[in-house]
């Protein structure tokens, strides 16, 4: 379990299947989940000073890369492709 520095929520990666992120509020209560983007399998969380990222391993390359960092927006329960993971 890792704390998102933006929201203060706790984020856990459940690796079964394509993977999903489980979200918990600051008190530890379940607050939702985020599924892997289509065509990706969630691999691991990456902590940076300003935000929490998750690496998605793609089935096919996008702009020459299979693996991408996705920014996690806990409040809207979305992932946004942020840059290649290498």
Residue ranges and their predicted role:
Residues 1-6, 36-48, 84-86:
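Repeated scaffold domains used in trafficking and secretory/extracellular systems
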Residues 4, 24, 72-73:
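Hydrophobic alpha-helical segments, especially N-terminal targeting/anchoring helices
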Residues 58-86:
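Short, compact, well-ordered microdomains
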Residues 22-23, 27-38, 80-83:
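Aromatic (tryptophan-biased) beta-strands that constitute blades/sheets of beta-rich domains
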Residues 19-21, 67:
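Repetitive beta-architecture junctions, highlighting loop-to-beta-strand starts
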Residues 1-16, 50-63:
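Short beta-strand elements that form the blades of beta-propeller/WD-repeat-like
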């Amino acid at each position: 379990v890792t704390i998102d520095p933006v929201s203060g929520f706790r984020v856990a990666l459940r690796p079964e299947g394509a993977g999903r992120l489980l979200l918990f509020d600051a008190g530890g209560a379940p607050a939702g989940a985020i599924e892997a983007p289509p065509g990706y399998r969630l691999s691991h969380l990456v902590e940076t000073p300003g935000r929490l990222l998750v690496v998605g391993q793609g089935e096919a390359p996008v702009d020459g890369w299979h693996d991408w960092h996705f920014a996690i927006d806990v409040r809207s329960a979305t992932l946004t492709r942020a840059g290649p993971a290498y």
